Curated annotation (Swiss-Prot):
Lineage of producing organism: Eukaryota, Metazoa, Chordata, Craniata, Vertebrata
Record-listed E.C. numbers: 2.7.11.1
Subunit composition and interactions: Interacts with isoform 1 of NEK2.
SMART domains per the UniProt record, alphabetical: S_TKc (SM00220)
InterPro entries linked: Kinase-like_dom_sf, NEK_Ser/Thr_kinase_NIMA, Prot_kinase_dom, Ser/Thr_kinase_AS
Protein name: Serine/threonine-protein kinase Nek11
Active-site residues from the entry: 158
Length: 645
């Protein structure tokens, strides 16, 4: 289980995580880029240094929480550990949580397909709608994820299209448990997370939050996937709340099956006890038939993937069998694995020294061979020039002597005889050429020892090596010089590196990794098993979980007022930035008076349009007032506004 890390020093202000690229967080996560920001905090894409290959990318969510008490961090740690145990293909994996400075950080699975809300807006702008079979498939995936949560007596509390993510065209419920983790036992956790489009009537009326509230939110997501709009919409915050609490139940367009519309309407029943549970919805005949079709399709896809994997594994085994590994190599690898990290570091330094010696030897051999070739070329060239000069001089002298000795009446020898004599004289002279006969004007160039040493030093300086002393005692100090700052943290890293190196030496270059690199294959296989379990399930006895009776874990609320105030502070700053400080104050004060006097919506809209171009621009201010009212109720204080509900 991952440890919950507490900041060594906690400053008074809110200090955000550095956004500088390649920033290392918690000595493990490398910051890649900023993905976005929300009401609770900022989301970053990070790379996990300790993750398997292909699984490095993760999401870090940074939430500013201010100063934390020790009991709060312990309680948060317990709930974070609970969330990290959840493993389902329709739920974004919760990896870890820790405190960095005064920010609460959550590490989750990375989904490259963005969230469902972005997908809906993309299709809406293009004038397209989702195919019916795609909506049914996604709806079933969400039902499987919600049923998995409710079976473990855990609520999501913030289901909405922004918290549903796509990965390989499969839906995954994200931000799971975040609001519950941050708000503790506060019944207003869902209310304080954003717009009210997905809130159930009982949550808005503070009548408790249970599994049926998640079912209501899931129905709102289904409607949004079908109609590309919210199930409950309005010009201002309170109008949306009134439609949810008192308005009529929306219906799907006629292009969708009546069975699907009936399912959605049953999920939007204002009486929580009359809403079906997730497993009951999956057992409805219409969806049961869709489940069987999906299971057959997923099984076929899984079978094809397994066949491909078997072929790759067979090729990998053949390559491994063909490669010869000596017993001595295996023994050496075994000895390396038994070493401590300190011994492995010493061994690597020895190997680096040997590698340097080999490179130096190679450089010297190359220089020696180059000098030998140059010397031979010069020797051959000077020898040819010397031979020509000597032969020409001897031939000339010999001809002069023959002329002097020859009588006047005798004819000179034939050209053939003269040539034979010349070749004979050349052979006699060519047997005795030495370096002593070379002229002094053309000396043989040679490499000076100091020049050779400078060349070697220049060649090795690029390798980043330093001089290794020849004295054994000094060399021992050289090999141990890096251990002064050695710590337990580097022990783990060195151990991992040392264990990876022998495997790389044995493994063939084209071999397949031992783990699955395609996450979609494992998700589809897991979904097929989930569908099989649902189809084989006959019991519909699913308990309703309420936050008032059965909570996730006992103990005091976590963060509560701190998180609520942080939320409202950011909302206030956002509204002031949009409207301007003076306009914001005017709208805020007017809406506060109007709600207290129970003014009509038409009157409020008319007055607001005198201050701002559109009354809808004041939606966030109206929402801020509502949140402030609910916070006062939660803290046991008397509300200042008129209760409309």
């Amino acid at each position: 289980m991952l440890k919950f890390q507490e900041a060594a020093k906690c400053v008074s202000g809110s200090t955000a995580i550095s956004t500088y690229p390649k920033t290392l967080i918690a000595r493990r996560y490398v910051l890649q880029q900023k993905l976005g920001s929300g009401s609770f905090g900022t989301v970053y894409l990070v790379s996990d240094k300790k993750a398997k290959r292909g699984e490095e990318l993760k999401v870090l969510k940074e939430i500013s929480v201010g100063e934390l008490n020790p009991n709060e961090t312990v309680q948060a740690n317990l709930e974070a550990q609970l969330l990290s145990k959840l493993d389902h293909p329709a739920i974004v994996k919760f990896h870890a949580s820790f405190v960095e400075q005064d920010n609460f950080c959550i590490i989750t699975e990375y989904c490259e397909g963005r969230d469902l809300d972005d997908k809906i807006q993309e299709y809406k702008q293009a004038g397209k709608i989702f195919p019916e079979n795609q909506i049914i498939e996604w709806f079933i995936q969400l039902l499987l994820g919600v049923d998995y949560m409710h079976e473990r007596r855990i609520l999501h509390r913030d289901l909405k299209s922004k918290n549903v993510f796509l990965k390989n065209n499969l839906l995954k419920i994200g931000d799971f448990g975040v609001s519950r983790l941050l708000m503790g036992s506060c019944d207003l956790a869902t209310t304080l997370t954003g717009t009210p489009h997905y809130m159930s009537p009982e949550a808005l009326k503070h009548q408790g939050y249970d599994t049926k509230s998640d079912i209501w939110s899931l129905a709102c997501i289904l409607y949004e996937m079908c109609c590309m709009n919210h199930a409950f919409a309005g010009s201002n915050f309170l109008s949306i709340v009134l439609k949810i609490v008192e308005g009529d139940t929306p219906s799907l367009p006629e292009r969708y099956p009546k069975e699907l519309n009936a399912i959605m309407e049953s999920m939007l029943n204002k009486n929580p006890s009359l809403r079906p549970s997730a497993i009951e919805i999956l057992k409805i005949p219409y969806l049961d038939e869709q489940l069987q079709n999906l299971m057959c399709r997923y099984s076929e896809m899984t079978l094809e993937d397994k066949n491909l994997d078997c072929q790759k594994e067979a090729a990998h085994i053949i390559n491994a069998m063909q490669k010869r590994i000596h017993l001595q190599t295996l023994r050496a690898l075994s000895e390396v694995q038994k070493m401590t990290p300190r011994e492995r570091m010493r061994l690597r330094k020895l190997q680096a020294a040997d590698e340097k010696a080999r490179k130096l030897k190679k450089i010297v051999e190359e220089k020696y061979e180059e000098n030998s070739k140059r010397m031979q070329e010069l020797r051959s060239r000077n020898f040819q020039q010397l031979s020509v000069d000597v032969l020409h001089e001897k031939t000339h002298l010999k001809g002069m002597e023959e002329k002097e000795e020859q009588p006047e009446g005798r004819l000179s020898c034939s050209p053939q005889d003269e040539d034979e004599e010349r070749w004979q004289g050349r052979e006699e002279e060519s047997d005795e050429p030495t370096l002593e006969n070379l002229p002094e004007s053309q000396p043989i160039p040679s490499m000076d020892l100091h020049e050779l040493e400078s060349i070697v030093e220049d060649a090795t300086s690029d390798l980043g090596y330093h001089e290794i002393p020849e004295d054994p005692l000094v060399a021992e100090e050289y090999y141990a010089d890096a251990f002064d700052s050695y710590c337990e943290e580097s022990d783990e890293e060195e151990e991992e590196i040392a264990l990876e190196r022998p495997e790389k030496e044995i493994r063939n270059e084209g071999s397949q990794p031992a783990y699955r690199t395609n996450q979609q294959d494992s998700d589809i296989e897991a979904l097929a098993r989930c569908l099989e379990n649902v189809l084989g399930c006959t019991s519909l006895d699913t308990k309703t979980i309420t936050t008032m009776a059965e909570d996730m874990s006992p103990g005091p609320p976590i963060f509560n007022s701190v998180m609520a105030r942080t939320k409202m502070k950011r909302m206030r700053e956002s509204a002031m930035q949009k409207l301007g400080t003076e306009v914001f104050e005017e709208v805020y004060n007017y809406l506060k008076r109007a709600r207290h006097q129970n003014a009509s919506e038409a009157e409020i809209r008319e007055c607001l349009e005198k201050v701002v171009p559109q009354a809808s621009d004041c939606f966030e201010v109206d929402q801020l007032l509502y949140f402030e009212e609910q916070l006062l109720i939660t803290m046991g204080k008397e509300p200042t506004l008129q209760n409309h509900l």
